[in-house]
Amino acid sequence: MTELKAKGPRAPHVAGGPPSPEVGSPLLCRPAAGPFPGSQTSDTLPEVSAIPISLDGLLFPRPCQGQDPSNEKTQDQQSLSDVEGAYSRAEATRGAGGSSSSPPEKDSGLLDSVLDTLLAPSGPGQSQPSPPACEVTSSWCLFGPELPEDPPAAPATQGVLSPLMSRSGCKAGDSSGTAAAHKVLPRGLSPSRQLLLPASGSPHWSGAPVKPSPQPAAVEVEEEDGSESEESAGPLLKGKPRALGGAAAGGGAAAVPPGAAAGGVALVPKEDSRFSAPRVALVEQDAPMAPGRSPLATTMMDFIHVPILPLNHALLAARTRQLLEDESYDGGAGAASAFAPPRSSPSASSTPVAVGDFPDCAYPPDAEPKDDAYPLYSDFQPPALKIKEEEEGAEASARSPRSYLVAGANPAAFPDFPLGPPPPLPPRAPPSRPGEAAVTAAPASASVSSASSSGSTLECILYKAEGAPPQQGPFAPPPCKAPGASGCLLPRDGLPSTSASAAAAGAAPALYPALGLSGLPQLGYQATVLKEGLPQVYPPYLNYLRPDSEASQSPQYSFESLPQKICLICGDEASGCHYGVLTCGSCKVFFKRAMEGQHNYLCAGRNDCIVDKIRRKNCPACRLRKCCQAGMVLGGRKFKKFNKVRVVRALDAVALPQPVGIPNESQALSQRFSFSPGQDIQLIPPLINLLMSIEPDVIYAGHDNTKPDTSSSLLTSLNQLGERQLLSVVKWSKSLPGFRNLHIDDQITLIQYSWMSLMVFGLGWRSYKHVSGQMLYFAPDLILNEQRMKESSFYSLCLTMWQIPQEFVKLQVSQEEFLCMKVLLLLNTIPLEGLRSQTQFEEMRSSYIRELIKAIGLRQKGVVSSSQRFYQLTKLLDNLHDLVKQLHLYCLNTFIQSRALSVEFPEMMSEVIAAQLPKILAGMVKPLLFHKK
């Protein structure tokens, strides 16, 4: 019978035999040249005469080039038929898709003997000569010093097999495609003693002959069986304990996959909790070994089939030694579950690393494996693989759920030990699979484990970081969070997207309460504006929008901000700020009745009567004069916005003795309408002169008066006139002082909201000036008398508009007053959410209110009459809101039925009507009122 003789790890494949696992495997890493004693003498294993060739590259270092090992010929050779039989059984097992729960009977003896060999204590007399120096120098010494060449100087506790993998459940190649029942070494063993397997009665560096046999897959206790074969995408492995399918010897055993009839053994030691040494995984290759193949392919560390780039040996050794010597480092003791793997850190460099074990919360459980999913052990790993990022150190209790992508290679993570300071990382691309949207760390006792939710574009969710600040090092917090900061102040969009992490990982939302800056509520119009009265957005106009009970609570006029809590009129105890002045309730009621009743009080003395708590009812004339001098304005509760200096000046005026004689009316009016120190009334304010200069010219409607009026022709002419007036309003507003300082969107909004008010107000002014309010003077070529109004289809609407010129006639409105009121009409309606240039808008409106007061003072020569005049004019402005609402409703109905009514609407006017009138009629705008209804 032909026998197969193995000539080392580079032995070619024999036809008809099992395929050599080394052939065709990608070049992943350098071979681990640790002294893994895998040969067993005939005394130790009488029934087994060969060691699997799959362990040859791991257990025995490759000889130097040109060196022919003397023990190349085997003493006990295994027949090819046995190898083929073992291979056929492995094929049958894999084809059946099942997994053996216990090793075959033939292998049980081998397992026991191997365990006896592995677990036997190493005596001083068992040290044997080490392999040649070339083998030692070519090894990878990542977790300890190189083995000395001197045999006596090599203690049994110095193992050099580099455990590079933390996830050992890999493809089994020709063996069973599942992770078989397995056992592990005791956790009490240190990593070095676990890796070194001293053979009782056999040399450490024995050159015993070997025979090829199928390589077993190295498995681990935390991997599930039933993982799919290499042809399909298997589910993500969970870190769960599995029942051991064999007798445990001494608390640990070596894993023996089914199909390894030749006694192939792959040992995967469990790491000690006191150390951070990762675990080793051996992967079986599928193709025969080609002649001349580098020995690097003989040992295939499963790096999820990611090409391995060179590693800095000195850096790895130094970092590993630092972690091993660190007494405060805890290798996963703080994990919530006893089976949770130790904490891992992301590899931020472009060097390839192995995928560490992820806890159960890292991935959402899949009901069934999906073919289109990205398994951890597929030939291609997409960018969707996340790397959990976590701060190292005993004090690091807050972990970051954000993950990043390794630059230059498919992402992976070194388990349990971080590399040196990494270069900056680019943000990870959004995940392509929702289930893999985030990888969170196992929750520690004082840490927060969650995943950030999807970002949203509108809000900055700040999260409050719990726990101690992370230490400075290679895994410092991301740039958006300063070390030790209490929260991330950057928008969520700037962070990597982990949209499905909150739901998939089962994160508790209570762990991340959304906070604002400095404990304040989150900014935004929806949170601060949409309240009745809009107190947050329009502080200058709170007096017009809120009742006295609310106005008395203004922080600017709280009692704490005033020097005294007395009435500025009579000296009694003040009850609040009424009509802009701190007064008592009696003076408040007196002033309101005196102004609304339009009483003409006369002083029996010389207008210098003493007004105090006892004698305040003796002379109502002097009491009213004193109210006006203090600054009380009926309906002008807005004027309590005057600063504290103004109030102190009023207090000083009350404290000083009144001058003897009748005070000058102009001085009293100046004291009443002075809004800033040194600003007195002028004869013609320059702003009013400017308003006169920019007033639009007369606009014609283009109506044909020779033809009889019809409903459609009259409405069409009015629409044409409205289009021209709308263009005139736009041109006029651009020349208006202060209007161009507003945001362009605010300018458009104000014009669209107020164009109807401006048109009907201009109609009333023209009707008042040209025809004394007897007719509706739309344009020089379109004047409707009462008869034409009755013949029209909108007679009731004409009566409504006719009220404005009649009111002008009653009040005898001056041009200066009209110009100031016209500007205030432009600024009397705003959106509910406010304007973008809210501050500039408030300043502009306040300035034109002052101009209106100046315009009133040009003709009114008395304080009482001026206050009454201001009340009447502002009341007219408030009444225009209801009148214009009727016009809006009629205009919208006509626009909707324009085809049926044969009424034409110009283009610009149609756009404004369609876009804004439904919103205005639905109450989605906020009118600014001077008086409470």
Swiss-Prot record:
Q: Where are the zinc fingers (NR C4-type)?
A: 567-587, 603-627
Q: Where in the cell is it found?
A: Nucleus; Cytoplasm
* Composition skew (Acidic residues), residue ranges: 220-231
Write out the residue ranges of the motif LXXL motif 2: 115-119
Bias-annotated ranges (Pro residues): 418-433
Q: Which parts of the sequence are annotated with region: AF2? A: 687-933
Q: What is known of its domains?
A: Composed of three domains: a modulating N-terminal domain, a DNA-binding domain and a C-terminal ligand-binding domain.
User: What is the protein name for this chain?
Assistant: Progesterone receptor
What is the organism of origin for this protein? Pan paniscus
